[in-house]
Amino acid sequence: MLFRSGLQRVRSSARQNILVFPWGDQVVQFLLAGVRTRTSHFFSNVACILLLLLTPAWASKPKEKPSQPALPDMLLEGGRKLSYERSFSSQREVKPKRGFWNKVLDFVAGEPEFRSLVRPYSIAVDSRGRIIVTDPGAIGVHIFDFQQQKYKFLSRAGKGKDPMLAPQCVAVDAQDNIYVTDSESGKVFVFNSDGKYQRALGSLKGGEGFFKRPTGIAVDSVAQRIYVTDTLRNKIFVLDMQGSVVQTIGENGEGPGKFNFPTELRLDGQNLIVVDAMNFSVQVLDRSGAFKYAVGKIGDSPGTMFRPKGIGLDSEGDLYVVDGLWGVVQVFNRDGDLLYYFGNRGTSAGEFQLPAGLFIDHNDRIFVVDSFNRRVQVFHYYGVAKPSKGGSQ
């Protein structure tokens, strides 16, 4: 055997050399005619090298990843349903398929390195459909643009001024600017829609209006306000777009409007929805901070929570809450009643290991950060069909 790749010289005589290599499920032989001279040996060796280069990149049948069986749709009341779409975990899945010569180059020089999710946490989707994922494990932010087949990684790790240490939650505004909380540096990093760093808000130097551990974030582009939960201060800071504090909401405690380690938050019309992690619930407040109602309590049965994480709202106003410990997503109506839940602890499609962030786009696609499985899983909620206007066509 000449090479482990499968290219072999099987016979040699004074009159001919025969090369054989695998082509899919068949074997192809090449006859190299000529007498046993230095010239024939030269061309024979050249042919061997060429075939070695071409066999992995072109001739051999590409190995296909075993596909997961399609998950059945979850059928809900009133003709609604929830479908599993896909998962993704690396830059490789965004880039277009590489052509023949690129594969040859990859074989000679080695395949390019692709970034993968390490310990993803939070997620947002901008108006262009780009999926933005914070990754404390990689100390940066991944931007997956499947429509344009582009990928970008944002990081300020190791920067002398305003270094990024532990990116947590992410939000986007109406102009697709990106806002990232950093729980260790105590700042909010702002990038423009192209991913260029703009500024940092907040400080750890102390004093009212400075963050200790910023986590959840939401942006109101109309009112020009930024909402940030500070988990250690047990309150929500409301900032203007320059980073000045204009209002604080909440205090430490267990009653309505009080928090015990608040984390994620979302804006919904005039409502402010906050994950109250160590009170094992989600509180719904108005923009002034007045309490409206709460969902959940500690427990291990449907409708209860143990480690509430990401939250989101679909087009019908139903509230989705990730439970990181139980590995499920629970769905509540506006009255706080549990409608259904999906997921389970595991590694298969539709299962989660320590899920964290959640985002629902305007098409009711549900993105769940499956943190310990190092991936994002995508589901699609199909609600009640709205009657068409204007009569029949």
Question: How would you name each of these model-derived features?
Answer:
Residues 1-2:
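Short, small-residue-biased leader/transition segments that mark boundaries at the very start
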Residues 7-9:
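Compositionally biased, intrinsically disordered low-complexity segments enriched in Pro/Arg/Gln/His
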Residues 28-46:
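Bacterial N-terminal signal peptides that target proteins for export
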Residues 44-54:
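Bacterial N-terminal signal peptides
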